[in-house]
């Protein structure tokens, strides 16, 4: 990047929080290089700028919430980096919605930089993200960068799985078995059915299109080791799922949004349907 002088054409996002020095200083000796505290942030950004050979980071994420640093310390420290021009935008990952909400309210009420993007686990099989994270992001105007959108590569059609086995390639896994679970098989079959309705066999493209159809400003984190993977990722950009297709995919694995949403309902500005409690008072309609 530096040698080709492409910095201004590239958006760089990186994170801090996870220990990145344990291998160097020794196990159990890297408390200064882990966590959300100011010291961890300082050394992490210092070293990231050096390694990336750049003067600034476009998006800096809090990687995960450690529950040991105060919201005030974290947001104050991050804002200093923005003021210094070392960071342009702030993101947060794998953190409870209540923490992000409190952090953004603190930042905006004190003239500091709030989080503008949230990164977390979300796919058609695991929809916990939809309980609090999406409504929170909608409220604050935050973008969403879901990871694990393709189920860690485990959303595969039966044909694709058999082809991988013939080549001696199993499904990638960090925990558990390399075989698909029953739920992964079912959702993969459903994704393939929808894919065929769009004239493709790409389960991956439909999995990506699903999250992009569910909310605004969704930028899925995608990967791949082959050119064909990249092509499937790009193919998703031209696919728009219908409400019926979304409903079908969501019928495969039941999802309970939980209390209080399953009691009072979702935001009528989104659903266009008022709470039954509201309708007890009068007939109210919500329009676009």
UniProtKB/Swiss-Prot annotation:
InterPro entries assigned: AKR_Detox_Biosynth (IPR050523), NADP_OxRdtase_dom (IPR023210), NADP_OxRdtase_dom_sf (IPR036812)
Coiled-coil regions, chain positions: none
Signal peptide: none
Pfam families xref list: Aldo_ket_red
The organism's place on the tree of life at top rank: Eukaryota
GO biological process, one term: aldehyde metabolic process
Enzyme Commission code: 1.1.1.-
Top-rank EC class of the record's enzyme: oxidoreductase
MF terms in GO: aryl-alcohol dehydrogenase (NADP+) activity
UniProt cross-references to Gene3D superfamilies, sorted A to Z: NADP-dependent oxidoreductase domain
Alphabetized UniProt keyword annotations: Oxidoreductase
Family: Belongs to the aldo/keto reductase family. Aldo/keto reductase 2 subfamily.
Protein name, UniProt field: Putative aryl-alcohol dehydrogenase AAD10
Organism, as annotated: Saccharomyces cerevisiae (strain ATCC 204508 / S288c) (Baker's yeast)
Lineage: Eukaryota, Fungi, Dikarya, Ascomycota, Saccharomycotina
